[in-house]
Amino acid sequence: MLVLGIESSCDETGLALYDTQRGLLAHALHSQIAMHREYGGVVPELASRDHIRRALPLLDEVMIQSGTHRDDIDAIAFTQGPGLAGALLVGASIANALALAWNKPTIGIHHLEGHLLSPLLVDAPPPFPFIALLVSGGHTQLMRVTDVGVYETLGETLDDAAGEAFDKTAKLIGLGYPGGPEVSRLAETGTPGAVVLPRPMLHSGDLDFSFSGLKTAVLTQMKKFEAAKLEGDALERAKADLARGFVDAAVDVLVAKSLAALKQTKLKRLVVAGGVGANRQLRAALSAAAAKRGFDVHYPDLALCTDNGAMIALAGALRLGRWPEQANTDYAFTVKPRWDLASLAR
């Protein structure tokens, strides 16, 4: 089965072709980072308009790259939610218009299910069951994954997502957009232990997260720098130490909760997905813990940690392979800006 995947939930336009026999044939991505940078964040209306401009050229790119003709495609998968309503509508409209013109079925995919399954795109994919740590700008969750469509939420953030905390911390420190990668880069130049920040809910006894207090601690520390009248090199060193303190705290919590989930479920495989899954400090800490405690940790390729069409095409192919009745052939569709992943559980 050959599936075309279309991702447009936020500020990346992604298209890809995935074949159940041959794997990922092609994927193309356009990021809107440069466009949104001057505003310090994603502007939903601009995001929607840019998806309209980019989708069809990216479609041409993946078709040419893979040598695929439209007659070869068996189905079209698109991100149905969660995400920005306007951006989702663009992708859904394009997917259903193409499907109508080409006489193909469609299937709407949960964005987080795409992330959750994206490590299956690697050459040696992890077998089920496993624990999934989903960490992105909008979501932080620990899931028990028994099979495609069989998900149990073990823990989730009670306020800010991890990626959101990274972005807000970057803004408080005065870094550019997107903030997550910027604060991570700055942290690598900071001194470990120079600034120690709280580890929210580290000993809560459950698998939930909270990052709002960590963000507040960063703000408090910046006010201390201001009161001390730090400037020049001294201020830059202090900011680097603060970034290091923030990243160390966030990583400690993510790792500790992941280890607790593995212990609670007695599973030996951890999958990490979502944009924060590309963070080098998080990967290093999890790899060290895996070596010490004897479990396997799996990630998607770095290029597929961000939003992308490949994960949507994969999820569509896996769902249609198991439940062909989920194919839509009347081309009526809705989008779901808010959509609980656990609601997909079968």
UniProtKB/Swiss-Prot annotation:
Gene3D superfamilies: 3.30.420.40
Keywords: Acyltransferase, Cytoplasm, Iron, Metal-binding, Transferase, tRNA processing
GO molecular function: iron ion binding; N(6)-L-threonylcarbamoyladenine synthase activity
Cellular compartments annotated: Cytoplasm
Cofactor (UniProt): Fe(2+)
Disulfide bonds: none
Domain of life: Bacteria
Listed GO biological process terms: tRNA threonylcarbamoyladenosine modification
EC number(s) stated in the UniProt entry for this protein: 2.3.1.234
Cofactor: record remark: Binds 1 Fe(2+) ion per subunit.
InterPro entries documented for this protein: ATPase_NBD (IPR043129), Gcp-like_dom (IPR000905), KAE1/TsaD (IPR017861), TsaD (IPR022450)
Keyword flag Nucleotidyltransferase: no
Main location as per UniProt: cytoplasm
Keyword Iron: yes
Binding site for Fe cation: H111, H115, D307
Known catalytic reactions: L-threonylcarbamoyladenylate + adenosine(37) in tRNA = N(6)-L-threonylcarbamoyladenosine(37) in tRNA + AMP + H(+)
Binding site residues for substrate: L134, V135, S136, G137, G138, D167, G180, N279
Known role: Required for the formation of a threonylcarbamoyl group on adenosine at position 37 (t(6)A37) in tRNAs that read codons beginning with adenine. Is involved in the transfer of the threonylcarbamoyl moiety of threonylcarbamoyl-AMP (TC-AMP) to the N6 group of A37, together with TsaE and TsaB. TsaD likely plays a direct catalytic role in this reaction.
NCBIfam families (UniProt xref): gcp_kae1 (TIGR00329), T6A_TsaD_YgjD (TIGR03723)
Family, as annotated: Belongs to the KAE1 / TsaD family.
Protein name: tRNA N6-adenosine threonylcarbamoyltransferase
Gene for this chain: tsaD
